[in-house]
Amino acid sequence: MKITKIDNKGIELITSFEGFRSKPYLCPANVPTIGYGTTRYPTGIKVSLKDTAITKEQALIFLKNDISFYEKAVDSLCNDNLTQNQFNALVSFTYNLGANALKTSSLLKKVNTNRNDPTIKNNFLLWVFGGDGTRNSKDDDGDGLIDEIGEKLKLEGLIRRRTAEANLYFT
């Protein structure tokens, strides 16, 4: 039977990296966010910094509503039957980065060519760059230039998340 829904392992992976915030805040992309990364309520209304605090139970309801979009994206983009853990890992990846990131990634190409290819782990780990232009005196993007304009930083949180997703994918 084809897997089309994330299970509790997948939910736990996402919540462990997203973290819970009861009050609205601006995420690194400068978007008002609440709960476990929710930017729109199930009604479709955007989160506002003026909104009231929510409980963990409400946040989980919002997260599950949000995840349904990413489950559909992973299901439609992957042309092979995935295991539950493979599906969970790809939904977590897509929830964090967006459906377009998965759609255009070498990760998806590898998954669709051979879902058990061990080099897929390396493709998860390509997606560990982000940041706001903070300088760290390193060549984070490997092009031989240190702290040039537009250089993205390797973020420890993204390294941990992509590693956890890759590990789940292969269990």
Identify the function of each model-found stretch:
Residues 1-31, 36-47, 54-71, 81, ...:
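Long, amphipathic alpha-helical surface segments
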Residues 14, 86-94, 123-125:
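Short alpha-helical scaffolding segments that buttress acidic/His motifs in well-ordered protein cores
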Residues 65, 92-93, 97:
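Short, residue-level hotspots on alpha-helical faces of the histone-fold
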Residues 73-76, 96, 100:
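Amphipathic alpha-helical interaction surfaces
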Residues 76-87:
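Short, structured surface segments that line ligand/substrate-binding pockets
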